Amino acid sequence: MNKRPDSKARLLDAASAIVAKVGAGHLTIDAVAAEAGMSKGGVLYHFPSKHLLLEGMLNSLLTDFEDRVTRHREQQDGPVIKAWILAEQDQTSNQRSMALALLANAAENPNLLDPARKFVQRTFSDVRSEAEDQDLSTILLLAAEGLRFLDMLDLLPLTDDERGDLH
């Protein structure tokens, strides 16, 4: 039996759908209300401002990513760097669109990315602390992040098959 998502999750899904369909520039409280089938007041109850909606989107992305890393660590015996790279490969197109929207909005409000900064700092620390070769692990993590950003910005000069061959 499918459980109906709670209102907050429904709103985050609606925001993600808007960004994926028409881009971050069209993400408004009114658009989220319409997409979610809720009133503007219902949206404002959960997210009193667009900034808080964006924070909710970021927290959702980070939680989702951390869950994927954990799942990969449980499925394979290997370092966190391997789980991180596999989790990045699992990212959906909606998640990429959300990340891009957050990045664009962070240009106006750099503090929006504070939770992501803490998350990445903790990850780099975890990767380095368990690595036999800290420099190599750091380079691998930086390369994986570079690959993800090139892909997110639609600048990656590799086919899906070529990218798949890299892991």
Residue ranges and their predicted role:
Residues 84-88, 99-104, 140-147:
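Short alpha-helical scaffolding segments that buttress acidic/His motifs in well-ordered protein cores
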Residues 10, 14, 18-52:
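Helix-turn-helix
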Residues 54-61, 68:
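Alpha-helical DNA-contacting segments of helix-turn-helix folds
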Residues 110-167:
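Hydrophobic/aromatic-rich alpha-helical bundle segments in the mid-to-C-terminal region
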Residues 1-6:
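N-terminal intrinsically disordered/low-complexity leader segments
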Residues 63-100:
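Hydrophobic alpha-helical connector segments
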Residues 91-97, 104-105, 109-121:
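Conserved, surface-exposed functional patches that form binding/active-site neighborhoods
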Residues 14-22, 68, 143-150:
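Solvent-exposed, amphipathic alpha-helical segments
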